[in-house]
Amino acid sequence: MAREVWLIVNRASGSNDEATLEALRAALDRADLAPARTLSVPDDPLPDRHALEAAGVELLVLFAGDGTANAALLPLDGWGGEALVLPGGTQNLLARALHGELSAEAIVGAFAELVPTRRHRVRSRHGDGLCEIVAGPGATWSEVREALREGTIGELAAATSEAVAQTSSGPMVSLADPPLGKPEGYPAVRLHPAGDAIAVDAYGAESLADYARQGLAILQRDFRQGPHDTLGRHRTVLCRSDAAIELMIDGERATGGREERFTIAPFGVTLLAHPDRDRA
């Protein structure tokens, strides 16, 4: 008996044009996973846990970016179904963590091989990150990615110029508890789940060339390629700055206070993953 499947897509995410969506639907059909309902963000509201339970949904397929995946999955904490996250956005950090560099069609084609897994999340008072939270003026690079996806060349140039200025001259963020890295801080601190701890990577730059390389790494969709210090794994981290700390939570912007504490916590939704991938 076929399971009840719902599909969430974001047509403004990544390269989700109609042809791409039709190819995905065909792949789902071949895998006997034809969705009973398709929800298109932002036109349709995201379903909550009670809506999925009332409809008997057993599998929720997400073909969208990290921000949409975050918004869709976090309210489902404790739901008894399974979620399949496919790469349908700009960076696709969560999909890459679960499936590597496989395409959405390849992941669906190998559905029978996927294994259920649980991950942790990085918690903050401004929202939880399933993939990462970036703290510091380097968080403004999220606007460059937005301009890259939706804007004109002029908007991209303006966003890039502003991000470089903010990263090079904005208030640094230090790691106060536990005390880690450079006392003067960094323009970007990346906190991401690693098992039952927070892995801390601090991105600094001593010259304009370093900033340029870091910006290029972000635009190339892999923040981790930028020059950085690896500062270990911790259950909790307190960041401090002389000004409000800019945040990027799974690609979405937020503004914190001068001190922000981050903790690790289990995430109570079962995700399907490639059997060879490390799970956080």
Residue ranges and their predicted role:
Residues A2-L7, A36, A83, P171-M172, ...:
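Hydrophobic beta-strand segments of well-ordered beta-sheets in folded domains
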Residues D77-A199:
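Catalytic core of DAGKc-family lipid kinases
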Residues E22-A26, D77-G78, E146-A147, G215-Q220, ...:
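Short, solvent-exposed amphipathic alpha-helical segments in soluble enzyme
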Residues G67-A69, I245:
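Glycine-rich nucleotide phosphate-binding loop and flanking beta-alpha elements
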Residues M1-F63, N70, L74, G78, ...:
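ATP/NTP phosphate-donor binding region
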Residues G204-A280:
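ATP/nucleoside-binding phosphotransfer catalytic cores, i.e., glycine-rich phosphate-binding loops
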